[in-house]
């Protein structure tokens, strides 16, 4: 995979022009024949939820946890996915084998259909699709070694009583796109977002950790943003190494006190951060070690 100005060469093939199959409403359908009507409620009113999963050596990492969150997101958005979690797990495993994806990405998505076009849409059909494709690093592999650069976004994560914050609902990513575009325009790779109280929250699609001078880790309390599956995994790895992890409110003024920083996420995996605005960080052995342990874990199990 090659990178150029934050674009992946593999992404130059438009996603609607690819070949193979997509699992769509219970059937394997030709990639080019999967269509969504322009008057779908999910498109106009963001009644849509999704997941993002990684395939390592032919096996989906923590598939059950991702599927469980997929169903939780749908329920929080007021609709039921018309399949069981076991059905979705089986379909996900089936599609990666059909597409011969060995190391890639899986995208389940569910949305309200086009039967109604209004704020209220309780009689709409719920559509479900699962697509997969070969995919390498989310960030430039060179930057995964040197560390990526973040600005601080002007957009903030909304207060938890204003949105279904503990979901992967499509509408929640609007400010993430705005923030990342602004960061890229100004020469950064990604953006750090604050919460509604002005404390550190997360990057546009990943959780964040900091290392202090004593070797302890600090990460924001996920009370207005996702408690990521990768975040929880890395905390478990850190504790197994007797690294103390403090989950707490972190003020941006504390950035100058930390010596290391990294992001975690299904796409980002474990990615070091070299700077946030004017605050610089070292890619230290602790971060390198956590990344190595994470890579060993995700590639531990092979597909049967």
Language-model segments: residues:
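Helix-start/capping segments and mature chain N-termini
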Residues: 1-94, 119-304
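Short, acidic/charged, Gly/Pro-enriched secondary-structure junctions
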Residues: 89-116, 133
